[in-house]
Structure formats: C-alpha cells, structure tokens
C-alpha cells in the first residue's frame, strides 16, 4: 500500500516525501537489513567461491592488469604463494547471511522505510583482515547501523543511512568488515539553478592535447610490484605517483558489471527481469518503449537521471572505490597489505569525466597491533578541478627491523547475521 505522501508517475516512477515517519521506519530497522539495499530475482552472489579466473576477470574489468591478481604463475612466487584478490573484489562475493526477522509484521511495516526516494552511494570504510585467495567462500551480512538527517541547500532534506557490512567464511573467520553510507533524497528535477551547485557543470570535451596528457599518464603508470616497500624507506610528506582514470564511458560501466555482477539489485534479462520486478516493483519504471526497465539505468539514461535530480548520466560509486583500490595497490606493491580504506564520493562522476588520482603519505608508525604501518590520504580530481573522491588508507608494510607483514587478528563476526550452515 502506498503511503499518503507517495505518488507514482505515468512511467511508474515512485516519488515520496522524505517524511519523519519514513525516517523512523528506517531507524526501526537498526540491526536488520536495509529494505532499500536488497537483491532482486536471486540472492546468489556473482562469485560464490573465489577462483583465479574470477580474480583475473575482476581486475581486468576495473582496468587493473597487476600480475599479482591476474597471473597465477607470477603470484605463486610472491609471499602469498598464489593468486590473491585486490581490495574491493569482495563486492562480487557474499552468500546471503543477513539477519532473519522474527516478526513478519515488523518486517512488512518497516519495508516501507524511505520508499520512493532516490538513493546515492556516498562512500564507506572497509577493514581487511586477510587476502581473499583461491577457494575462499564468503557469507555476507548487511544491516542498518545509524540514520541521520541532513539539510542542504542543494538537496534540501536528506537521510544518511550508515549500513554495516561483515563478510566471513565457513569457520567464522572475518575477511572484511566496515560500513557503507547512502544518501536518500527526494526525486525531483532541479528547477532553481541558483541553488544547484552542479548547474554550471557542462559535459566533458577534450582537445587532442588533453587526450595526449591522459594517454601519457597511462603510459607512465607506476606499479611497485616485487620491489618491496620498507617502512624504513618511507618518508612522511612523500607524494605518491599520479594515476589517471577515464574519461569515464558506458563501456567502463559494462566492464565493471562484467567483473562484479550487479552488486546489489540484480538487473537480469527477459523472464528473469519480470521475476525481479515482482520482488522489487519500485525499482522498475517504463522506458521510451513503454516497457519496464530497472532504475539502474540512471547511470546510462540521461532522461531518467534528470528525473531523479541529476544533471547527466553518472557512475556507480563502486567505480571510484575500485580506482582507490588500484591506486593504493600499485603503490604498496606485492609485499604490503591494505588494511583499511575509507572513501568518500564528493561529487557526481559524469559520463565523460576524467579522474586524476594523487596521494601523500601523512604518517608512519609502529602500531601495537598492526606493526609497521603508513597512513595515506588521496584524492581524485576531475577535469573541472573538483574533487570527486577523497580517501584515506592504512597500509601494513614490511620492515627490515620487524620483518614481513603479519596479518592482523580479525574480530568476531557481527551478531546481526544468520549462522553459517
């Protein structure tokens, strides 16, 4: 049943007010799965078990050909002894392990939380406890952790939902935990340009000279590889080698989904699309043919993007999360271990935009639990000079005095989950 503030347009797009009632329903979900972040036709992950092929495909599909992830013969001669997955590969994994509901009425009532408002991934923070290797099978729990309300000149009222994440294996060993942040804002076209900070942003266009600058950066992309980064050689204030990503194209988005699957909702074809719409009715609208298609197409359909309040087609947040992972692993090399990545999406990354990645070492220390670590800050800046992503990372590194990296002791799995079979 629709709420009193809910309206559906002729094309099936549900529009709701961001009401106190709807926000409270989301707060009632704390410790339980977020009803706006769920799967469609199937709960199965893209990769049930990590394989060398899956890791290679993922890496290629995010634009990374690091042999540590792509070449088993190379990887077996590293300290890991086999192919490992780069940080963020876990987005392609995770058998459904969300907490079950004891009360069907509670589940049904709270399923209306923030229905009919647009969701934007705004960032997250992940902690990595061990590399994903061949044969690893992971379960995943997502749950609401916190709900905040924000007022802004651009979006008006919005709700920021912090979603907890935990991934573990059959022995309850945690590989990844952390949070993702999603901003929920009302679906509406921007009509007052004076209040729209994106109003002056025009689609990208590059001269031959600008394209050459991008291609020269690709030609000179740095990768440390087997050249071990030692703690003793690190100097605070050192700038990291620049990396470029883009110009972002729909082809890049297709590749990302080839490597990760659909990540969340699942946009399957033909009869499976019909089955998915039965489960996620609010996630489908009619297209220019009056046929039903998923709202995921805001990322490649300019008209729909405008209807939900975005000026142009834009990327999925995971695209830039993968940029950060690639930037960090290129610098850290084979013998380091990326323990923590915090990433914040600052602006939309429109189709056609380029992202220049830069970073700096801001701290080094002997951590009592992690051993030798360095702290890195990085940013991605587009061709307009605006940051579209900021990130920080904790990297565990080898030391001549203290020896190779020793993997940290993982925490216990979240209590907000179902037990592993």
Show which residues each predicted segment covers.
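Generic structural signal for residues positioned in beta-strands
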Residues: 57, 89-90, 125, 179, ...
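Hydrophobic beta-sheet segments that form the core/acyl-binding groove
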Residues: 122-171, 179, 337-383
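Flexible glycine-rich active-site/ligand-binding loops centered on an Asp-His dyad
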Residues: 158-168, 174, 178-200, 394-401
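Residue-level signal for well-ordered, solvent-exposed loop/turn and beta-edge residues enriched
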Residues: 172-174, 238, 386
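Ligand-binding pocket scaffold of soluble enzyme catalytic domains
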Residues: 181-182, 351, 358-366, 373-378, ...
